[in-house]
Amino acid sequence: MSSRSRSTFLAISFFVLIDWVSKLAVLLYRGNLPDARPILYQYSWGKLIFCICPTFNEGAAFGIFSKYKYFLFAIRIAIILGILAFLFLRKKRTSPSIRFSLILLCSGAIGNVGDILFYRHVVDFISIGFKRWYFPTFNFADIFISLGTFIFVYKLYFPTKQKIK
């Protein structure tokens, strides 16, 4: 295994581990509470609100397409396999930022697919809000997917200029 492949594998493993350990910690903590209350932790900073409140999502982003579980699962697996094939089988060097964005995308997808395999749904637990408005609950895998997508799209639309030698 080349050093590039090894570092890619380790990076994906690291991000997936962050996602799975955080979800497991939240679920174990929730299971130890006598009343299984929905909010495990809440912190307010002025008008900003941060909550740890586990919820379960059977669809895609924000629960959409929850009626198409098997189709979504197949799409997720195809995306993971496509990204892994690109990362590990491509001989030509890829820019580090594109490579990192694909590592984040793949890690997030693997994290959520792991949830589906182990729990039959995706475990979301991070909730943020401002005054009375709350963003839909999410997890670290969702953060990785969003950040990876942002970096990927940014690098496609605003590529760095290469000096011609």
From Swiss-Prot:
The active site is at D124, D142. Pathway: Protein modification; lipoprotein biosynthesis (signal peptide cleavage). It is found in: Cell inner membrane. Its EC number is 3.4.23.36. GO terms for biological process: proteolysis. It is a multi-pass membrane protein. InterPro entries: Peptidase_A8. The keyword Cell wall biogenesis/degradation does not apply. Its main location: membrane. Keywords: Aspartyl protease, Cell inner membrane, Cell membrane, Hydrolase, Membrane, Protease, Transmembrane, Transmembrane helix. GO terms for cellular component: plasma membrane. GO terms for molecular function: aspartic-type endopeptidase activity. It catalyses: Release of signal peptides from bacterial membrane prolipoproteins. Hydrolyzes -Xaa-Yaa-Zaa-|-(S,diacylglyceryl)Cys-, in which Xaa is hydrophobic (preferably Leu), and Yaa (Ala or Ser) and Zaa (Gly or Ala) have small, neutral side chains. It holds the Pfam family Peptidase_A8. This protein specifically catalyzes the removal of signal peptides from prolipoproteins. Belongs to the peptidase A8 family. HAMAP family: LspA (MF_00161). This is Lipoprotein signal peptidase. It comes from Chlamydia caviae (strain ATCC VR-813 / DSM 19441 / 03DC25 / GPIC) (Chlamydophila caviae). The gene is lspA.
